[in-house]
From Swiss-Prot:
GO terms for molecular function: ATPase binding; calcium channel activity; calcium-dependent protein binding; cell adhesion molecule binding; glutamate binding; glutamate receptor binding; glutamate-gated calcium ion channel activity; glutamate-gated receptor activity. One of its GO terms (cellular component) is postsynaptic density, intracellular component. It catalyses: Ca(2+)(in) = Ca(2+)(out); Na(+)(in) = Na(+)(out); K(+)(in) = K(+)(out). The record marks N614 as: Functional determinant of NMDA receptors. It is a multi-pass membrane protein. The keyword Phosphoprotein applies. It comes from Rattus norvegicus (Rat). This is Glutamate receptor ionotropic, NMDA 2A.
Length: 1464
């Protein structure tokens, strides 16, 4: 150091200490001062001012210290000069810390600084040169920190370099330089505890103080290509020179040294060979200025932390001069706060040994230009290297290059080259893979990146390994950086071809297609794989058509099934059953039950439909043999049809996968993609042979597909599956592999891998390469030995190719069954429309169809009548004016029917029946026109004292809804045979049989009009009336009385509990209140008659009649009684408005004859018919003439003589016109079932009862056939000849029909045998079926030539009264519980206990008075037994006339006339 430098050191302390007194005072009050010295070697291009300016106000912001930087440059850095400068600086400036950097590569500098620090306790930072070099065995009390890495950290990086390049075999060479033991120990420990397959062959420790001969002997032990060297830089020169003489430097040897050997990178000894690898502290990216700044930051940060914690900074030693004393270690030093320091966002922490925790190390190599080159970086425990393949350097000019080690480039493309990550545990490549390096970009803008170690395998990798063993070469494998095969762009080749052309690689191995353009710049080997261009498409899930469930059969088959076969077969079954002699009552055969179950076309279609689909639906099976055969054949057809449908259904319900069909590159989809909607989308990977081929041969196609090109094969596969691409054009070998290994096998190649522009894959070598011939011979050998075929089977065959014939089943989704759900939805919509139309028709439109709107016969009636006329050939005379369809019109028609009768029976000796009348018959004035007034709805009845009959006040409101409620709640009223308004028992005028007198009240009750099909021709009625009696003018109705009281004249409400659903229309009638009855009232006249003079069972009317009989010209009375309901309906009476419930309830006694032997001696008279009354045939007893209905078989106590006296009259009457039929011997207790000739002729005009077509062809029953069996108690249980047997058929007779008792020539068709047996078991009425018909006639001989046509009158099998019927529940049952027990109940309940022969001969008739009492009182029930009564009228016509229903009768008749209209 010169004189100037010496004087500077003497004056500097004085300058630092001297201050102005004011400044000293301020300093005492200000923050504590921190003095830091910076000493650098003079060789650095930096001045002291620049060093002081490195710490400015911006760095001191936020610090509680006043930092003073003292900068000093030194010319010499030898140990003596270094100690002198530091001691002088400490004596003058009292520094707290020192930042030291030199430009030497001598580790002695670090040792001197460590000594000073341990003596003065001043923290010293060695930031550069020898001060930062590795130092072993530091003083424990030292506070010396270095910007460098420890021996262990550098050894770790050296092993990482060998691991990345797979240099697992190595040798270790060291000297006795301090720290070598630590280095050897760490290497051995790491190798022994690592999963990497390290092989440390030799550990050689040299002593350079001996002769060179011994060094050479030890170096000759090295047989590995990788050598780790730990020594000083001077020792390394000696060792490397000896290694060169031994041939241990060159292409195949890699020397790796720590930073001790490299030292100062600017000083490179000539003995260092090219390719020498060193791990050094980063001098390239970490400048000296940055290191100084970081050193200052570390010291100030540690001082601030100490000040914050202890509120003081330790004072430094004033001088290092003086007598040596034993140093005392302070309790708290700055060293403790320098271990964990973070400055300027960087972790600058130090270890306990004084080295950085995260040093910035780099890998440098001595290149061929003899310069250190940075090739890698260690940062954050990660090593990144520049070269994918470590470059082979020519160490010296006299070294020969090694041509057997090749650099090979490849391209990732499965299955030829598959790239995988290294094993995370061993950090190496597993078996059957080779190491390969892949370049990964870190910064896309600067293309900066790093090579990452990967593992490669695949078809081409296996070929490469075979070639390496056969041809004898080694290689380094790396992946092409741009991921392309090779294309010439701007006269520059890229991809694998570019690597070979520009000699960065010796050869290129992979899926490289041989073509003419590439062959011009590189040499190709023989093809090892045949390939070309192919097209890959994706299978798309096909949609299932909504009509898929119909596709198992063609449209013609469905038409034949549902239109032809079903309809035709149903019609055939119906026709066979219609005309079958043993079928249902649909063929109008003679003798069949007129209202039995019918077999319609609808039932036939329903039966066949149920058979087709095996539905468990209730059907009605035919009974005819022919129709059964037809149904059986249809059932066999249904089995075949359904089985065939089920077998083919699965094939049409699955989703068929759709694949685009492409024939080749010339396909229209490729050449004219815009012709499709949407346009056909296809593409390829650019810069390949496929794109070049398309560009050269199909320019338009190439121009179109550029927008759909893909970056790689994997991206193309994803685009195919997601629908972004319709077709992918690429190498056939790759596409076949991808199709075979695709998950789900959704990707397929067209034509099962059809190839266009066939070519092959080859290995590209540099032009004129000496390896070409050897590689060609090896490849041909592989093909000949079958090794190539084995590799193809291993890598190129996929699992999808083996599963082409496998059937894959899947669950049916909603798309598969969509058509069936659509059909159900359509059916529900159609049902809703039908439901709305049904209600619209019922409430709005049906009146016009039934003729209410036009006051003419309705359309349905006309169609039904026309069908009947066509089938039976009956001429129906058109009327000029249709009958009135209101209530008055119905009564007028019945009046004309009564007037058209030839004779009216003159009945006398009317018995006082159970007519609960509040008024006597004598109170009324006899008027011949009473019927006309009643029918005309005038209500002009008067008493004998000229008082008007007062109507009752209505107990119900005038609201029509109440009436509709009553109609809806009615239970047992049969509106088809309802009574007239104010109706009461008929009293026939005895003196004048042509006049009718009826006791009628003015109470207006709504009655139903008869069915239109039962109406008689107005012309015929008029003609008959003219022949018998002129038509009275009273039956001409006024216009105001022609009102429509019913909504429909065709359908009449039936009994809800009894009616048949198929034939009943429950419609409410409109009640009409007469004008003259609004304010009339009547008195409650319930009386109990005194039965002293007259019979006890006579009512008031009967007794009144008997009293006045002597002065009356009447001779006969015809009354009809039916069963009565118990008194007082809790539910309002139907069709009654003016009703007053009596306060005192009385139940009339029931007259019954308890003598079972009465009249058993009577005989049957010959059959005759007299239009007039047969007075001779009448009994002499006037008391009970023709009105003995109160006496039944229960009257066992009556004497025979009394019964003979009371029931001695032997004539019957016409049930319609009431004319007498006296020639028949029999006493009738109720209305006759027979008609006269006139009524028979009139009844045939509009009546379309099917029974009219039945001719009585049965043979007359002989006496033996009829009376051949003897019954027990024959005389007591004989049928009384005066007991008329009238059978009443309930609506449930259609369910259980009565067998034919009389006509044995025709079988019964009531029910099927199976149902009959089920119903007969344990049935109270089951005995009816088993009684012989011959027993029904007793022992009397038949007097009729045609047999007993009793089957025309069916008797209900079930009890007639609700109390005896276990299946019905009436409102009367509830009434009895509320009001009390009816006096007639004992008789009603005792009836079923009679004899067996009597149980099935009993019928219940509702008395006329039960519904027609003047005060609408409650009714009582009577039970009478009837004779089995044959018809007495001569059957001189073709048709037998059914019973005419008229409104004057109160008999409950549930039998409904059949209608073809209901079946149509």
């Amino acid at each position: 150091m010169g004189r100037l430098g010496y004087w500077t050191l003497l004056v500097l302390p004085a300058l630092l200490v001297w201050r102005d007194p004011a400044q000293n005072a301020a300093a005492e009050k200000g923050p504590p001062a921190l003095n830091i010295a910076v000493l650098l070697g003079h060789s650095h291009d930096v001045t002291e001012r620049e060093l002081r300016n490195l710490w400015g106000p911006e760095q001191a912001t936020g610090l509680p210290l006043d930092v003073n930087v003292v900068a000093l440059l030194m010319n010499r850095t030898d140990p003596k000069s270094l100690i002198t400068h530091v001691c002088d600086l400490m004596s003058g400036a009292r520094i707290h810390g020192l930042v030291f950097g030199d430009d030497t590569d001598q580790e002695a500098v670090a040792q001197m600084l460590d000594f000073i620090s341990s003596q003065t306790f001043i923290p010293i930072l060695g930031i550069h040169g020898g001060a930062s070099m590795i130092m072993a065995d530091k003083d424990p009390t030292s506070t010396f920190f270095q910007f460098g890495a420890s021996i262990q950290q550098q050894a770790t990086v050296m092993l990482k370099i060998m691991q990345d390049y797979d240099w697992h075999v190595f040798s270790l060479v060291t000297t006795i330089f301090p720290g070598y033991r630590d280095f050897i120990s760490f290497i051995k420990t790491t190798v022994d505890n690592s999963f990497v397959g390290w092989d440390m062959q030799n550990v050689i420790t040299l002593d350079t103080s001996f002769e060179d001969a011994k060094t050479q002997v030890q170096l000759k032990k090295i047989h590995s290509s990788v050598i780790l060297l730990y020594c000083s830089k001077d020792e390394a020169v000696l060792i490397l020179s000896e290694a060169r003489s031994l041939g241990l430097t060159g292409y195949d040897f890699f020397w790796i040294v720590p930073s001790l050997v490299s030292g100062n990178t600017e000083l490179i000894p000539k003995e260092f060979p090219s390719g020498l690898i060193s791990v050094s502290y980063d001098d390239w990216d970490y400048s000296l200025e940055a290191r100084v700044r970081d050193g200052l930051g570390i010291l100030t940060t540690a001082a601030s932390s100490m000040l914050e914690k202890f509120s003081y900074i330790p004072e430094a030693k004033a001088s290092c001069y003086g007598q040596a004393e034993k140093p005392e270690t302070p309790l708290h030093t700055l060293h403790q706060f320098m271990v964990n320091v973070t400055w300027d966002g960087k972790d600058l922490s130090f270890t306990e040994e004084g080295y950085q925790v995260h040093p910035r190390l780099v890998v440098i190599v001595l290149n061929k230009d003899r310069e250190w080159e940075k090739v890698g970086k260690w940062e954050n425990q990660t090593l990144s290297l520049r070269h994918a393949v470590w470059p082979r350097y020519k160490s010296f000019s006299d070294c020969e290059p090694d041509d057997n080690h090749l650099s090979i480039v490849t391209l990732e493309e499965a299955p030829f080259v598959i790239v995988e990550d290294i094993d995370p545990l061993t950090e190496t490549c597993v078996r059957n893979t080779v190491p390969c390096r892949k370049f990964v970009k870190i910064n896309n803008s600067t293309n900066e990146g790093m090579n990452v170690k990967k593992c490669c395998k695949g078809f081409c990798i296996d070929i490469l390994k075979k070639l390496s063993r056969t041809v004898k070469f080694t290689y380094d494998l790396y992946l092409v950086t741009n991921g392309k095969h090779g294309k010439k762009v701007n006269n520059v080749w890229n991809g694998m071809i570019g690597e070979v052309v520009y000699q960065r690689a010796v050869m290129a191995v992979g899926s490289l297609t041989i073509n003419e353009e590439r062959s011009e710049v590189v040499d190709f080997s023989v093809p090892f794989v045949e390939t070309g261009i192919s097209v890959m498409v994706s299978r798309s899930n096909g949609t299932v058509s909504p009509s898929a469930f119909l596709e198992p059969f063609s449209a013609s088959v469905w038409v034949m099934m549902f239109v032809m076969l079903l309809i035709v077969s149903a019609i055939a079954v119906f026709v066979f059953e219609y005309f079958s002699p043993v079928g249902y009552n649909r063929n109008l055969a003679k003798g069949k039950a007129p209202h039995g179950p019918s077999f319609t076309i609808g039932k036939a279609i329903w039966l066949l439909w149920g058979l087709v689909f095996n539905n468990s639906v209730p059907v009605q099976n035919p009974k005819g043999t022919t129709s059964k055969i037809m149904v059986s054949v249809w059932a066999f057809f249904a089995v075949i049809f359904l089985a065939s449908y089920t077998a083919n259904l699965a094939a049409f319900m699955i989703q068929e996968e759709f694949v685009d069909q492409v024939t080749g590159l010339s396909d229209k989809k490729f050449q004219r993609p815009h012709d499709y909607s949407p346009p056909f989308r296809f593409g390829t990977v650019p810069n390949g042979s496929t794109e070049r081929n398309i560009r050269n041969n199909y320019p338009y196609m190439h121009q179109y597909m550029t927008r759909f090109n893909q970056r790689g094969v994997e991206d193309a596969l994803v685009s195919l599956k997601t629908g972004k691409l319709d077709a992918f054009i690429y190498d056939a070998a790759v596409l076949n592999y991808k199709a075979g290994r695709d998950e789900g096998c959704k990707l397929v190649t067209i034509g099962s891998g059809y190839i266009f522009a066939s070519t092959g894959y080859g290995i590209a070598l540099q032009k004129g390469s000496p390896w070409k011939r050897q590689i060609d011979l090896a490849l041909l050998q592989f093909v000949g030995d079958g090794e190539m075929e084995e590799l193809e089977t291993l890598w190129l065959t996929g699992i999808c190719h083996n599963e082409k014939n496998e059937v894959m089943s899947s669950q049916l989704d909603i798309d598969n069954m969509a058509g069936v759900f659509y059909m159900l939805a359509a059916a529900m919509a159609l049902s809703l429309i039908t439901f709305i139309w049904e209600h619209l028709f019922y409430w709005k439109l049906r009146f016009c169809f039934t003729g209410v709107c036009s006051d003419r016969p309705g359309l349905l009636f006309s169609i039904s009548r026309g069908i009947y006329s066509c089938i039976h050939g009956v001429h129906i005379e058109e009327k000029k004016k249709s009958p009135d369809f209101n209530l008055t019109g119905s009564q007028s028609n019945m009046l004309k029917l009564l007037r058209s009768a030839k004779n009216i029976s003159n009945m006398s000796n009317m018995n006082s029946s159970r007519m609960d009348s509040p008024k006597r018959a004598t109170d009324f004035i006899q008027r011949g026109s009473l019927i006309v007034d009643m029918v005309s709805d005038k209500g002009n009845l008067i008493y004998s004292d000229n008082r008007s009959f007062q109507g009752k006040d209505s107990i119900f409101g005038d609201n029509m809804n109440e009436l509709q409620t009553f109609v809806a709640n009615r239970h047992k009223d049969n509106l088809s045979n309802y009574v007239f308004q104010g109706q009461h028992p008929l009293t026939l005028n005895e003196s004048n049989p042509n006049t009718v007198e009826v006791a009628v009240s003015t109470e207006s009750k709504g009655n139903s009009r008869p069915r239109q099909l039962w109406k008689k021709s107005m012309e015929s009625l008029r003609q008959d009336s003219l022949n018998q009696n002129p038509v009275s003018q009273r039956d001409e109705k006024t216009a105001e009385n022609r009102t429509h009281s019913l909504k429909s004249p065709r359908y009449l409400p039936e009994e809800v509990a009894h009616s048949d659903i198929s034939e009943t229309s429950s419609r409410a009638t409109c009640h009409r209140e007469p004008d003259n009855n609004k304010n009339h009232k009547t008195k409650d006249n319930f009386k109990r008659s005194m039965a002293s003079k007259y019979p006890k069972d006579c009512s008031d009317v009967d007794r009144t009649y008997m009293k006045t009989k002597a002065s009356s010209p009447r001779d006969k009375i015809y009354t009809i009684d039916g069963e009565k309901e118990p008194s007082f309906h809790l539910d309002p009476p139907q069709f009654v408005e003016n009703i007053t419930l009596p306060e005192n309830v009385g139940f009339p006694d029931t007259y019954q004859d308890h003598n079972e032997n009465f009249r058993k001696g009577d005989s049957t008279l010959p059959m005759n018919r007299n239009p007039l009354h047969n007075e001779d045939g009448l009994p002499n007893n006037d008391q009970y003439k023709l009105y003995a209905k109160h006496f039944t078989l229960k009257d066992k106590g009556s004497p025979h003589s009394e019964g003979s006296d009371r029931y001695r009259q032997n004539s019957t009457h016409c049930r319609s016109c009431l004319s007498n039929l006296p020639t028949y011997s029999g006493h009738f207790t109720m209305r006759s079932p027979f008609k006269c000739d006139a009524c028979l002729r009139m009844g045939n005009l509009y009546d379309i009862d099917e029974d009219q077509m039945l001719q009585e062809t049965g043979n007359p029953a002989t006496r033996e056939e009829v009376y051949q069996q003897d019954w027990s108690q024959n005389n007591a249980l004989q049928f009384q000849k005066n007991k008329l047997r009238i059978n009443r058929q309930h609506s449930y007779d259609n369910i259980l029909d009565k067998p034919r008792e009389i006509d044995l020539s025709r079988p019964s068709r009531s029910i099927s045998l199976k149902d009959r047996e089920r119903l007969l078991e344990g049935n109270l009425y089951g005995s009816l079926f088993s009684v012989p018909s011959s027993k029904l006639l007793g022992n009397k001989s038949s007097l009729f030539p045609q047999g007993l046509e009793d089957s025309k009158r069916s008797k209900s099998l079930l009890p007639d009264h609700a109390s005896d019927n276990p299946f019905l529940h009436t409102y009367g049952d509830d009434q009895r519980l509320v009001i009390g027990r009816c006096p007639s109940d004992p008789y009603k309940h005792s009836l079923p206990s009679q004899a067996v022969n009597d149980s099935y001969l009993r019928s219940s008739l509702r008395s006329t008075a039960s519904y027609c009492s003047r005060d609408s009182r409650g009714h009582s029930d009577v039970y009478i037994s009837e004779h089995v009564m044959p018809y007495a009228a001569n059957k001189n016509t073709m048709y037998s006339t059914p019973r005419v229903l008229n409104s004057c009768s109160n008999r409950r008749v549930y039998k409904k006339m059949p209608s073809i209209e209901s079946d149509v």
